[in-house]
Amino acid sequence: MTYFTSWDEFAKAAERLHSANPEKCRFVTKYNHTKGQLVLKLTDDVVCLQYSTNQLQDVKKLEKLSSTLLRGIVTQ
């Protein structure tokens, strides 16, 4: 598992992993209510990328990343 501390690094790695094999990739979001923390995980069962945040601005970036990944699926 690779844990990222920077959103930009996570987003670039997620796009690379997804473009390599979009059929096997899974994108999971988990929110911990007590800690106020959002955990994002993208995996293809070989490589696992994780990013954790408690910032609202990162949620908006998540929306942009998920739309980019979905756009990649639709265009194939």
UniProtKB/Swiss-Prot annotation:
Heterodimer with SRP14; binds RNA as heterodimer. Component of a signal recognition particle complex that consists of a 7SL RNA molecule of 300 nucleotides and six protein subunits: srpa-72, srpa-68, SRP54, F37F2.2/SRP19, F25G6.8/SRP14 and ZK512.4/SRP9. Keywords: Cytoplasm, Ribonucleoprotein, RNA-binding, Signal recognition particle. GO terms for biological process: negative regulation of translational elongation; SRP-dependent cotranslational protein targeting to membrane. PANTHER family: SIGNAL RECOGNITION PARTICLE 9 KDA PROTEIN. InterPro entries: Signal_recog_particle_SRP9/14, SRP9, SRP9-like, SRP9_dom. Belongs to the SRP9 family. Component of the signal recognition particle (SRP) complex, a ribonucleoprotein complex that mediates the cotranslational targeting of secretory and membrane proteins to the endoplasmic reticulum (ER). SRP9 together with SRP14 and the Alu portion of the SRP RNA, constitutes the elongation arrest domain of SRP. The complex of SRP9 and SRP14 is required for SRP RNA binding. GO terms for cellular component: signal recognition particle, endoplasmic reticulum targeting. Its main location: cytoplasm. This is Signal recognition particle 9 kDa protein. It is found in: Cytoplasm. The keyword tRNA processing does not apply. It comes from Caenorhabditis elegans. GO terms for molecular function: 7S RNA binding.
